[in-house]
Design a protein with these regions (language model features):
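Short, intrinsically disordered low-complexity segments
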Residues: 1-2, 112
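Sec-dependent signal peptide recognition
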Residues: 2-8
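Short, linear, compositionally biased motifs with a strong N-terminal bias
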Residues: 10-11, 129
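Boundary at the C-terminal end of the N-terminal hydrophobic targeting segment
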Residues: 17-19
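Acidic, serine/threonine-rich low-complexity disordered tracts
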Residues: 21-109, 142-235
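Mid-length scaffold segments of soluble, non-membrane domains
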Residues: 115-162
Length: 235
């Protein structure tokens, strides 16, 4: 018995820090699972546990780290993001493609958003370059000041207040190692615009086919600056 305990301790010490920080596998509620069930594909060939990004706006570049764990449902991941100033925890469908349940907090505020509706008109996950598609989502949002409660969620009869539709296109498919030397397989470059946000001119991201994980890397807005990110760690 003592040998087994020592072996477990040694094994834990040999793991990277993100792997040691692994609580019980999150259990999804049935409502979230049903929202994406029509768009599910087979489980990914490969897994990723940690991604570090560097960039943002040229005026104030920063680094942010994502710690990723599987859940009890394929292609839905538990993601903890830390940028050094704040932390958010979310459940993401296909990585950062769609936040299903997200909590963000700082010293003063707690922000919570839960996915209430989701649809896409094409199974873009397996579609070739050149494919155009749309998807939409609706969410319920709660913002509370620490020590107070201020529910800003729209009433159930008026969910369209938090409804948005996106128009997207798969522009090309590239070797994933172009983004980082550790990434295997191919990556689809996807560009989207949000029809309900006039300031949001476009988002470019990459879907890592072997990992079933989407990462947004460039945001273009009507403001002077452009947010651009690069992958500095992938393990």
């Amino acid at each position: 018995m003592k040998k087994h305990i020592i072996s477990i301790i040694l094994l834990s010490a040999a793991l990277p820090s993100w792997a040691q920080d692994h609580a019980a596998i999150p259990q999804l509620d049935d409502n979230l699972r049903r929202l994406v069930a029509p768009y599910q594909i087979e489980p990914p060939k490969r897994t990723v546990g940690k991604i570090t990004l560097f960039g943002g706006s040229p005026e104030s570049p920063q680094s942010k780290t994502l710690i990723i764990h599987p859940t009890d449902t394929p292609n839905i991941f538990s993601i903890r993001l830390n940028d050094g100033e704040s932390e958010r925890v979310s459940l993401g469908f296909l990585g950062l493609w769609e936040d299903m349940d997200i909590e963000y907090s700082d010293p003063q505020w707690v922000f919570r958003r839960k996915l209430k509706g989701y649809s896409q008109d094409t199974l873009w996950q397996t579609a070739p370059a050149g494919t155009q598609f749309g998807y939409s989502s609706s969410t319920k949002t709660t913002i509370s000041e620490r020590g107070k409660q201020n529910d800003m969620a729209q009433p159930a009869s008026d969910e369209n207040q938090n409804y948005i539709r996106y128009s997207c296109a798969i522009k090309r498919e590239i070797p994933a190692r172009t983004l980082h030397k550790n990434i295997q397989g191919s990556a689809k470059e996807i560009r989207c615009i949000g029809s309900e946000n006039s300031n949001w001119l476009g988002l470019t991201g990459y879907y890592l086919a072997d990992y079933h994980f989407y990462i947004p890397l460039k945001l273009l807005t009507s403001l002077p600056s452009i947010e651009k990110w690069s992958i500095t760690e992938f393990e």
